[in-house]
A protein has these predicted regions:
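Bacterial N-terminal signal peptides that target proteins for export
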Residues: 1-6
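Hydrophobic helical h-region of N-terminal Sec-dependent signal peptides
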Residues: 7-12
Length: 187
């Protein structure tokens, strides 16, 4: 009886001290070890791909989408080359490189877009917008296409520069879309 009680207690303790990680298709989970007693903590360098993995209760995880992600940015009061205030809806599509999500989380954190991409992207777009007149920004598709290409190139260069200075940023720029300008409602 004592052996059975000990065995049941051991099994219950083992089950209670574990959690499961189950990323869906198109996702990777990054394990973050936080041992209470033994072992070393930090980001596990091997991502958990689609399926199931059991971890210690003290281990947390971050789910990272491996599909292209769209980040919409609304630019209010962007200035054209004649200081006309215009509003824009823009979008950058980024994709985390396969099996490199642990590097992303380790180097830039769970909020990597907000931490290192968002403001730089907005500033680059504003810079290009200020080179053109309101008519071109509202109706000339060729101008908007040239801005898309230039912003994409500049963002790729920015990510490469960040990777050299602060550790790899394993993200690819899939596409940039600058919508046509809308007259600012305040004017």
């Amino acid at each position: 009886l004592a052996k059975n009680m000990l065995l049941c207690g051991t099994i219950l303790f083992g089950m209670a001290s574990c959690t499961s990680v189950t990323p869906d298709a198109g996702e990777e989970a990054v394990l973050i070890h936080k041992p209470y007693i033994f072992g070393s903590g930090g980001v596990d360098e091997t991502p958990v791909e689609t399926g199931l993995k059991y971890t210690w209760f003290s281990t947390s995880y971050v789910t990272v989408s491996m599909l292209p992600q769209k980040f919409d940015e609304k630019l209010d009061d962007a200035t054209s080359n004649d200081n006309t205030l215009l509003d824009f809806n823009t979008q950058i599509q980024l994709q985390v490189q396969d099996n490199r999500s642990p590097i992303l989380i380790k180097n830039y954190g769970e909020n990597w877009y907000e931490n290192v991409i968002q403001e730089q992207y907005r500033n680059i777009v504003r810079g290009y917008i200020s080179n053109f007149g309101p008519f071109d920004l509202m109706s000339n598709r060729e101008v908007l296409d040239s801005i898309n290409i230039a912003v994409k190139r500049d963002m790729e260069n920015y990510i490469a520069s960040l990777s050299q200075k602060h550790g790899t940023l394993p993200v690819d720029v899939v596409n940039v879309v600058i919508g046509r300008a809308l007259p600012n409602e305040k004017q």
